[in-house]
Amino acid sequence: MARGRVAREEEPELRVQRSEGHYVWDTRGKKYLDFLMGWCVGNFGWGNALMEKPARAFKGPDYVYPGFDYPPWDELAELLVSIAPEPLAVCFRATGGSEAVDLALQAALIHTGRRKFLSLEDSYHGNTLAGLSVGASENREKRKNLLPGCRKVKPPLDEKALARIERELAGKDVAAFIMEPISMNLGVLVPEAGFIAEVQRLCRKHRTLFIADEVATGFGRTGTLFACEQLGIAPDIMTVAKAITDGVGGMGAMLASAPVARSMEKHGVFYSTYGWHPRSVDIALATLRFLVKNEKRLLEDMAATSDYFRSRLQSMAFGKTAEVRVRGLAIGIDFRDEKYTSKLADRCRERGLLTSAEGETLLLIPALDVDRDTARKGLDILADAAGPPAARASRKSRAAASSKAS
């Protein structure tokens, strides 16, 4: 085994040289249209002046010891709470989504005095021991020492799932139910409003906390600032990260209701060496202020772009029956065939389009400000990659002949 290398779970698909706007270039100079955006990180494209300017112009302290105070921390907490769903009231600093989820689970344990958690099967909530424990059960098969008492409810989210949730909560030993309001990892899975309302009722009835994991969906991705808004969710705890700095700095946060926050502040441990680094805070403040100031226009433009994606995808000829799921610019195309989905993502990348194969679903996650022409280019590449093999071969030979002639 070679020394001095970065550990990998699998071989990387791309060696990145640079990024700008809606595009990424690899080390060979090939240009890719990015409909992945770091998996919900770059909401406003790469190298956006809105975030780059405060990052370059920052004149604050290099670092603030977590035991000290730093006024911009309070500014950011106040701004986050002002746009978050009620009853969230207090912010806890984190370096990213995994740490934010860890804090959320710790807060639930402390506040309720219970030791068990309930989540959706095949979900993803981070790479810490706690996040892996409430994620997909395959994690437990590979790692035998994850947290005990983490139970799963299998989709679809129907009456059967509700009955399972009620049985689990009735024991009054579940600290929290955690889910993404709109699950990106489950292929943009959108629960019915009635399902969510009943889950919240059951959580309140059995004094189980509701944790909304908005690490991927927060800050506009699904067509509202937070996916919770669309489903009428009033979470006890919410986690955010990813797009909060548009990829320019690492940051996450756990937001809690006042009662949960009091319990956590009194009995919890939440020291974070690099949580809310001063430079990242400056960038996050610029990002969120832009969102708040331009929310109406941004979301209206997104809605129109979302409709365009939906219309194109629903009429697109795929090699498999496809279910198209679109919420804002969180887009999932479910083929019920993991192998086909993986190959389609590979064909897209070969043609210069970056997407994500999540099991049986192909995810498209473009920047929220993607223009119509760029959206059309990406969808044209997808249509070409998804076309019948004979048609793809014909196009490839024509392109080769044209290149040779020139």
Put a short name on every predicted segment:
Residues 1-406:
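Conserved N-terminal phosphate-binding loop of PLP-dependent enzymes in the Aspartate aminotransferase
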